Amino acid sequence: MASVFKVRSASGHVPVVRTLAAMMAVTVVLTACHGGGDNHPPPQANVLPAFITASSVRTQFYDGNTDDLLTAGLGKTGLASATAPAIANAAQPTAAELRRLAIWSNYRALVDMTANGGYGRFWGPNVDLNGNDTLGEGKIAGKEYLAFADDGSGTQNVTVLVQIPASFNPDQPCIVTATSSGSRGVYGAISAAGEWGLKRGCAVAYTDKGSGNGAHELSSSLVTLIDGTLQNATAAGKASLFTANLGNTDLASYNSRFPNRYAFKHAHSQQNPEKDWGRNTLQAIQFAYWALNDSYGTLNGSTRNVRYTSGSITTIAASVSNGGGASLAAAEQDTSGLITAVVVGEPQINLRLPAQVSVAQGGVPVGAFGKPLADYMTLANMLQPCAALAPAAAGAPYLTALPGATTTSIRTARCASLAAAGVIAGADATTQATNALALLHQNGYQTDSDLLQAPMWDSQAVPAVAVTYADAYAKASVTANLCNFSFGTTNAAGTAGVTPAVSPMLTVFGNGNGVPPTNGINLVFNSGAGAADHRLATADGSYAGASCLRTLWTNGTLTGSVDAIRVNANLHGKPAIIVQGRADALVPINHASRPYLGLNQLSEGAASRLSFYEVTNAQHFDAFLGVAGFDSRFVPLHYYNLQALNLMWSHLKNGTPLPPSQVIHTVPRGGTPGAAPALTTANLPPIVASPGINAITAANGAVNVPN
């Protein structure tokens, strides 16, 4: 069957768009005749995995010049630009323009993009695998395969994407996964893991985990398709990335009471998508096998034979944050040898902890460990605005556009509300704030992250996660307005219900992160006085809503869904590396990597091949490192994620032993906040083969991390 060709632009770049009609023959089962005593099995046809929606599959080739796999044609320079890529017709962005915007925004969202912070010198499209500036603009030619994984209902529509670089060696095949971090779209981990895989010549298997940036504008019934373009929800049908499960009557009623609101896939799919993140990662790998066989299998008429069978390709499951947790879950669930090894950064993972697991630092038990996200995030969302006023948090980076006086007023009022509710004690704001910070310490937050409590809430990272995950775990409909929160557009004063001058839907695929506030869609609290930006809806920053979210955890409402996402830390002897910053204030290290190490050691014993590298002066968001106060105090975790990937590659290919678990004592850049000196290797000591007194130990489930 003839392939379909479409011209992308007047530049002369002509990517190939091959519809599934041209590939359907791969589902035909081949029969072969063998004679003369040939004992070889007959060739096997390359069959599209049953979970892939056949009509959704599409491929494109990028020439590595006008467009490419890593930078969407922007190159190192274009990615570094703070100016978003242009859209010719703002009222109707094309799929190619939205892809370019998504790659630009997602790349920048996970790494420090400043030259002094390391971009272009330690990482970036121009930096080769040895850390040298040899790759110019760093554009990478190759082919993309894009599809939905679904059960036939059209309600899952997990996006899977495979990038095969032109440098892929079919005789030495490799796959690197890049499961999206956060609730990002399918390109969410392109800088965190995809880039390294492409430079290594590996196919990269991406997935949005079924929680990626699908938005539904309820007032217009516009939804996004797999490529980010828009369509009416009814017309889109099963091709919609996400459509809220609402009847026409319910939708009309909700719109009349709460105009200009939005449903998001992670929050409102009512499927608890996190329970499937490991499976989604495995599906992405299976799709990569199919894509590689489609590209390199022997041509047999109109079909391709299977060249690569399950387990025959060196595959590293890699990503960060939620993508890191998904990678660990996938490795635990892998029963067919799809995953060879695991390398993850700052994994968000929820553990099924037995009593034998314990965590200590310097021989002293930590305040708490192994709590699930639903627990620690709802607590932090209540306490952080108040804790920000504690003397120990003075001088924290300021990460909000609100005036300083407004922020101080919110913090003071939050302290008063917490005290009135009996959550904290103290007769004045300073005492109350100190008590709030102490309560965070008691619940597993490191003193290393004291200066991050304020920016985690001010940036709205913590409120956004608290609301979205509560919705997801409660399997709440968008019409529930769980705890009186909703997602909507607001005016300059923060008032909700306003019709935006330009719909955020046009670019939500490119700019959105899947967790409002994002791309002009804000987190709204519907109070008795009216609906507004949650920070401004009440004097205390919508404390009633935050308290309600906390109660959903403490009263057991979320328990069933949280239990469904817990893992056992049994990696079945796969070599694995976890890297995390000690100062992480979004996913506290005491609730993630440290207890995972203990549980893994307990589960696997002597068979465990997990190494854990804890990095001092590193926190969760490398993209914040260009902000004043972050630059001078914190180092990039991404640097160590790259080192870990190189260490694992050497281990798999050369048998080089993985360095044991250890603390890496980094040196902050110092200097004036906002003008810190350039990052150098003096700030970034290496991961060492013999850590000595910096070794992290785990025995019988007990983890001890040296100070």
Swiss-Prot record:
Could you tell me which pathway this protein works in?
Lipid metabolism; butanoate metabolism
Signal sequence, renumbered to the chain: 1-32
**What is its EC class?**
hydrolase
Chain's role: Participates in the degradation of poly-3-hydroxybutyrate (PHB). It works downstream of poly(3-hydroxybutyrate) depolymerase, hydrolyzing D(-)-3-hydroxybutyrate oligomers of various length (3HB-oligomers) into 3HB-monomers.
For this protein, the parts annotated as crossing the membrane are none
Catalytic residues (UniProt): S321
The organism named in the record is Paraburkholderia xenovorans (strain LB400)
EC number(s) stated in the UniProt entry for this protein:
3.1.1.22
- InterPro entries annotated for this entry? OHBut_olig_hydro_put
Entry GO MF terms: hydroxybutyrate-dimer hydrolase activity
Q: What is this protein called?
A: D-(-)-3-hydroxybutyrate oligomer hydrolase
